[in-house]
């Protein structure tokens, strides 16, 4: 699996969510609404989720192993940091 495209929409409200991202995998499948969030230990990538009737959040789509998660997270954060640096 290869991340072939990352599209970033910055969130400018000053909150913890910094951007909403769409990731294309193998030029064949896209996952929308991935979030870049500022946490206590820096930026992290949150997979798209929805709230269940009992108030919990459940991922809609997510990697099923650590290797896939790392590839997606690295591609997303690299694109975000590259775009952020280009805006200054």
Swiss-Prot record:
* Entry keyword set: Cell cycle, Cell division, Septation
| Cell cycle recorded as keyword | yes
One Pfam family here: SpoVG
Judging by the UniProt lineage, the source's domain of life is: Bacteria
| Gene Ontology BP annotations | division septum assembly; sporulation resulting in formation of a cellular spore
InterPro entries hit by this protein: SpoVG, SpoVG_sf
Free-text function comment from the UniProt entry: Could be involved in septation.
Sequence similarity: Belongs to the SpoVG family.
Q: What is this protein called?
A: Putative septation protein SpoVG
Point out the gene that encodes the protein. Answer: spoVG
